């Protein structure tokens, strides 16, 4: 890493899948790294590299990147949803990133839903629970497999319920999807909108802009903009 770090680097921004203390750069519980408990990441890296370091949740970095450099740059109130091994969100209100007191404002996957939570039904766990993977289901759907298409339709219904929950809580102008599952949006979009017909405020759904992020490395761009 020392060969990659050039003398003209002015700052470092890092997004981690964890609740963090953004002001002090403390990482509390990184998903997938059990040993990372209350790691003072900002202090460690600033001592090593001698430049300011900014640490935030990875979904917040995604939202910051999308709102500054991507599809949401024209909107003030945006919720950016990362669909992958889990599901989380970054929230922009009035053009500013909203993190909550402990940077956990977007932990929507942990909200109870049906018999489990939204993460079980709106991430790759949905497909694993049905004996496949998101990648395999996507490839089968591309080939026209009826079973795979039906699976994505079911998934889209759950995403529609997730969007409804976001509308009730935040009433954003736009929702932008990202993550490894977002590229399959074309397979679950219709079912999502079918579910949204149940939302009681039709005008809200009509004016809501829903899309997928297309900017490459948008999370890295967001991390670079952290303050």
Positions of predicted regions on the chain:
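A secondary-structure boundary/capping signal
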Residues: 15-16, 29, 83
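Conserved hydrophobic "DFG−1" position in protein kinase catalytic cores
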Residues: 18-21, 91-93
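A charged helix-plus-loop insertion that forms the helical arch/lid used to bind
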Residues: 25-38
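General beta-strand structural signal in soluble alpha/beta enzymes
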Residues: 53-58
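Glycine-rich phosphate-binding loop of actin/hexokinase-like ATP-binding domains
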Residues: 73-124
């Amino acid at each position: 890493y020392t060969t990659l770090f050039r003398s003209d680097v002015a700052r470092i921004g890092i997004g981690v899948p964890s609740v963090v203390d953004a002001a002090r750069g403390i990482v509390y519980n990184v998903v997938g790294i059990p040993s990372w408990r209350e790691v003072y990441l900002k202090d460690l890296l600033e001592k090593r590299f001698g430049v300011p370091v900014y640490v935030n949740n990875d979904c917040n970095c995604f939202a910051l990147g999308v709102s500054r450099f991507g599809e949401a740059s024209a909107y003030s109130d945006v919720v950016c949803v990362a669909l992958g091994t889990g599901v989380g969100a970054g929230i922009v209100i009035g053009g500013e990133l909203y993190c909550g007191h402990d940077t956990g404002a977007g932990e929507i996957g942990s909200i109870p839903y049906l018999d489990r939570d939204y993460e079980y039904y709106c991430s790759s766990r949905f497909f694993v629970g049905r004996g496949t993977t998101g990648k395999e289901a996507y490839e089968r759907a591309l080939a026209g497999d009826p079973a795979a298409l039906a699976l994505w339709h079911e998934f889209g219904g759950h995403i529609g319920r997730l969007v409804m929950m976001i509308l009730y809580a935040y009433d954003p102008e736009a929702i932008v999807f990202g993550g490894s599952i977002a590229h399959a949006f074309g397979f679950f979009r219709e079912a999502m909108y079918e579910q949204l017909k149940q939302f009681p405020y039709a005008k809200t759904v009509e004016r809501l802009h829903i899309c997928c992020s297309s900017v490459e490395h948008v999370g890295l761009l967001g991390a670079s903009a952290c303050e």
